[in-house]
Amino acid sequence: LVSIRPAFNLYLTPEDAGDLTSSLDKLSHKIFFDQEKLKKEMARSKSFKEVLIKGDISRKEVAFVEENNMSLPGIHIKAEPLRNYVFNSLASHTLGYLGEISKTSLERHKDPSYKQGDFVGKNGLENIYESVLKGEKGYKEVEVDVSGRELKALRKFPPQSGANLHLTLDVRVQQELEKAMKGTVDQNMNGSVVVMKVQTGEVIAMASNPSFDPNKFASGISPENWNALVDDEWHPLQNRSIHGQYPP
């Protein structure tokens, strides 16, 4: 249901960029990115620190950057792991989604393993089992100069994967259930169905309509997509199976 796939993320190291305005202008003709947000990130960061331009760029965008790397100094691509919801919106309310950790959460938990910009479970099982799914970050001990520039690496510690979560959900039952709901429930209506083993309480399938695609959250949801979800009168983010209130 959920896996990790490589995402191609586009970065900028300002001090290596040469004519930064020219490079970003050329880049913006082929790749859409938030230039104002990038400028704010650059203002907060030192010029030798890389700054994310855009996450999870397409293969076509990767090809453009690679083909023009000589005229885009300081701009480079890194392959990094990204959460992948294999069946898109299937069981989305049960699985939940990821989102960037808020400043409030950072201040409240004071967990040194988190920093601003990290993605954490925001809802569903992603949120409930965040502590066991997140694993441990890799890090390295380095020698730096007075400005904080890295001179050499002293020791490296590889990252540790999080635990796997085994569910009682039956994918085939879940697929048939959601297919049946979409075939019988009007697009402008809502509803939910839960299939359980009475003897054990195991949840075999849990569907809520309308649903959403958690992949849109994995690398940071756009303001347009977020507004479309929260402004929808049928509240697709609500799990009606467990959060709805209904008359007897």
What are the roles of these predicted feature ranges?
Residues 1-33, 125, 151-154, 164-186:
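Helix-start/capping segments and mature chain N-termini
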Residues 157-202, 206, 218-248:
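Active-site loop and adjoining helix of the penicillin-binding protein/serine DD-peptidase-beta-lactamase fold
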Residues 16-21, 46, 54-62, 87, ...:
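Solvent-exposed, acidic/flexible segments
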Residues 9-24, 211-231:
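A short, polar/charged loop-to-alpha-helix boundary motif
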Residues 1-3, 17-19, 25-37, 70-75, ...:
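Bacterial peptidoglycan biogenesis and beta-lactam-recognition machinery
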Residues 25-29, 43-162:
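Small/polar-residue-rich segments within soluble enzyme cores
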Residues 6-8, 13-17, 56-58, 70, ...:
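Solvent-exposed coil/turn segments that connect beta secondary-structure elements
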Residues 8, 92, 191:
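Residue-level detector of short, conserved catalytic/binding motifs and their immediate flanks
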